[in-house]
Amino acid sequence: MASIEALVEEIGKLSLTEASELVKALEDKFGVSAAPAVFAGAAAAAPGGEAEAKEEQTEFDVELKAVGANKINVIKAVRSITGLGLKEAKEMVDGAPKVVKEAVSKEEAEKVAKELKDAGAEVELK
């Protein structure tokens, strides 16, 4: 135990440059890192935008970007998705880009997007 205390005393006498070189040499010799470990609890408790930015989006808007060559099939798909009448669905398709569905779950948004893409439309999830 006395040898450990003596070693600590000797390390305490090192300059910052020498201490940095000692840390680097120990990292190289033993294959370890002196960087502090980050625990999930500490990261979650830390205030800031990083944790919020990594949260997964839960609500999506499905936007019809372009109609494509198969306009009639896209109108049919829009009618079946939205429940709109023929005239309203045609106006929506003609006015693209338009949001077809707002604030829907990821699964529903993907289902709607697939249906529109299969009809020939260009779609974007926001």
From Swiss-Prot:
CDD domains noted in UniProt: Ribosomal_L7_L12
Superkingdom of the organism of origin: Bacteria
GO terms under biological process: translation
Gene3D superfamilies linked to this entry: 3.30.1390.10, Single helix bin
GO cellular component assignments: cytosolic large ribosomal subunit
Keywords from the named record: Ribonucleoprotein, Ribosomal protein
An example Gene Ontology molecular-function term: structural constituent of ribosome
UniProt keyword annotation of Ribonucleoprotein present: yes
Similarity comment: family membership: Belongs to the bacterial ribosomal protein bL12 family.
Function noted in UniProt: Forms part of the ribosomal stalk which helps the ribosome interact with GTP-bound translation factors. Is thus essential for accurate translation.
Record note on quaternary structure: Homodimer. Part of the ribosomal stalk of the 50S ribosomal subunit. Forms a multimeric L10(L12)X complex, where L10 forms an elongated spine to which 2 to 4 L12 dimers bind in a sequential fashion. Binds GTP-bound translation factors.
Name listed for the protein in its UniProt record: Large ribosomal subunit protein bL12
Source organism per UniProt: Chlorobium phaeobacteroides (strain BS1)
